[in-house]
A protein has these predicted regions:
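Mature, function-bearing regions of proteins
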Residues: 1-154, 158-316
Length: 316
C-alpha cells in the first residue's frame, strides 16, 4: 500500500511538472500545444518518419540547448539581429515568440505534408512584412527582408548546426545515418519557405558556416539581445535550469564565436556530463509521454505507414 501511495504521488507530481513545462513552451494555459490539431490532422504522412534523424533529434530534450545556441548564432549576424529587434515580440511577449518558433519546428517535423504546407504559408506571410535596413559588418547600410534567401539560409544553418551539435554533445540517442542524414533530410523543411539550395551534407554546412563568418559582427544591439537571451523573463522556478542550459549552449559554440559573444569560455568537458544528467532529470520529471509524437504516430498508423509501432512503408 505504501508503494502504491508513493507511486500515485509521483504520478501526480509528474503530471503537474509536465503541465507547467508545456505551459512554458506552448504559452497555452492548459499546457496543450495549440498546434496539436495540425499534427493529428489528415491521414497523410509527413516529411519525416520516427526512425529518421530529424524526428529523433527534435524529439530529444537536447533541442532546448540547441535552441539557445541557435539564437546566439543568429544574434551575431546583423541581418537576422535587426529582424529580431525590429519586428519580433521577443521583449514584450518572449514566451509567445518562443512558442511561435516551437510551433514551426514541431509542425514541420511531425505533421502531415498538408499541415507543413499550411504552416509554411503562415511563416511566409509573416516574413513578407519583415523588411527594413541593417548595417553590415563593414559598415554598409543595405535593405533586408526576412524572405531574402541569403538571410533565410543563415537562420536555417544556425538552427541546423545548433540542433545537430547539441544532439551530438548532449544526447545519448544516436542519429540514424549520422550528421549527413540529418542535414540532408532536414533540408526539406525550408523548401516550402523558398530556400531550395540548403546544405545537403555536414561538409557543405561547415563550408556555409565559414562563408558567413566575415558577415558576423558585435554591436551594442547584439549585446542587448545576447543579454536578453542570457536572462530572459522566465518564471523564477525555471531560471536555475535555464541558466545552466545557457552555459551548455555557450560551451558548445566554437571558440571564436564565444570570443565575439564575450561571456567567457565555459568548459565543455565539465558541463557535458552534468547537462546530460540534467536533461535526463527533466525528462524524468515531466514523464516520457509526448502528446505531439503520440499524435503523429497515430496519424502514421492511419496512413498505413506504420503498423504495431513499426515503420512498414518508406516514402519516395
Amino acid at each position: 500500500m505504501l508503494l502504491s501511495s508513493r507511486s500515485l504521488t509521483n504520478n501526480i507530481l509528474q503530471k503537474i511538472l509536465s503541465k507547467r513545462f508545456r505551459i512554458l513552451l506552448t504559452g497555452d494555459p492548459d499546457g496543450v500545444p495549440p498546434w496539436l490539431g495540425a499534427i493529428e490532422a489528415s491521414d497523410e504522412p509527413g516529411l519525416f518518419l520516427p526512425d529518421e534523424a530529424p524526428w529523433i533529434a527534435h524529439a530529444d530534450l537536447a533541442t532546448m540547448v540547441g535552441g539557445i545556441r541557435a539564437l546566439l548564432m543568429q544574434a551575431l549576424h546583423p541581418g537576422s539581429l535587426t529582424g529580431v529587434r525590429t519586428h519580433s515580440r521577443y521583449k514584450n511577449d518572449p514566451l509567445g515568440r518562443l512558442s511561435g518558433t516551437i510551433r514551426w519546428l514541431t509542425v514541420t517535423t511531425f505533421a502531415s505534408t498538408a499541415s507543413v504546407s499550411a504552416e509554411a504559408d503562415r511563416v511566409n506571410r509573416m516574413h513578407a512584412h519583415v523588411k527594413g535596413k541593417y548595417t553590415t559588418a563593414s559598415g554598409k547600410s543595405i535593405d533586408y527582408s526576412a524572405a531574402d534567401p541569403h538571410l533565410l539560409r543563415w537562420v536555417h544553418i544556425a538552427f541546423m548546426d545548433s540542433f545537430l551539435r547539441c544532439h551530438q554533445i548532449y544526447s545519448t540517442r544516436p542519429l540514424p545515418g549520422g550528421a549527413d542524414a540529418y542535414i540532408r533530410l532536414w533540408s526539406k523543411s525550408v523548401t516550402p519557405l523558398g530556400l531550395d539550395d540548403a546544405p545537403m551534407s555536414e561538409a557543405e554546412m561547415l563550408s556555409e558556416v565559414a562563408r558567413y563568418r566575415p558577415e558576423l559582427a558585435v554591436t551594442e544591439e547584439t549585446r542587448e539581445v545576447i543579454r536578453w537571451i542570457k536572462n530572459p523573463p522566465l518564471p523564477a522556478a525555471a531560471l536555475p535550469a535555464y541558466s545552466f542550459l545557457f552555459q551548455a549552449a555557450l560551451a558548445s559554440l566554437p571558440r571564436d564565436y564565444q570570443d565575439m559573444i564575450g561571456l567567457g569560455h565555459p568548459p565543455l568537458h565539465v558541463l557535458r556530463p552534468f547537462t546530460v544528467k540534467l536533461l535526463k532529470l527533466i525528462r524524468l520529471a515531466i514523464g516520457p509521454e509526448s502528446p505531439i509524437e503520440e499524435a503523429a504516430i497515430v496519424r502514421l498508423h492511419r496512413a498505413g505507414i506504420m503498423e504495431e509501432g513499426k515503420v512498414t512503408q518508406r516514402q519516395k
